[in-house]
Each structure stands twice: as C-alpha cells, then as structure tokens.
Curated annotation (Swiss-Prot):
It is a single-pass membrane protein. It comes from Trichodesmium erythraeum (strain IMS101). The keyword Kinase does not apply. This is Photosystem II reaction center protein Psb30. PSII is composed of 1 copy each of membrane proteins PsbA, PsbB, PsbC, PsbD, PsbE, PsbF, PsbH, PsbI, PsbJ, PsbK, PsbL, PsbM, PsbT, PsbX, PsbY, PsbZ, Psb30/Ycf12, peripheral proteins PsbO, CyanoQ (PsbQ), PsbU, PsbV and a large number of cofactors. It forms dimeric complexes.
Length: 43
C-alpha cells in the first residue's frame, strides 16, 4: 500500500490538468474547421 501512496503523491496533477486543457484547445480548432467543411458551411 505504501507504493501506491508514494506513486500518487509524486504525481503533479496541476501539470496534468494544464496539459489536458492545452490538448483540448489545440484539438478543438481543427475539429471545428473539419465539421464546418463537412457541412459545407462558409469558413
């Protein structure tokens, strides 16, 4: 059990959250453009 507590105490959850938000923002741009292109809308 000590291994699990040491493992989780060493994880920097703030960094993981920031990288996750950055990835979501970076992915959102191309996704919007692809969805508009598939619908035939004006960009």
């Amino acid at each position: 059990m000590g291994f699990l507590t040491d493992f989780f105490s060493n994880i920097n959850f703030e960094t993981i959250a920031q990288l996750t938000m950055l990835a979501m923002v970076l992915i959102a741009g191309p996704v919007v453009i692809v969805l508009l292109a598939l619908q035939g809308g004006d960009l």
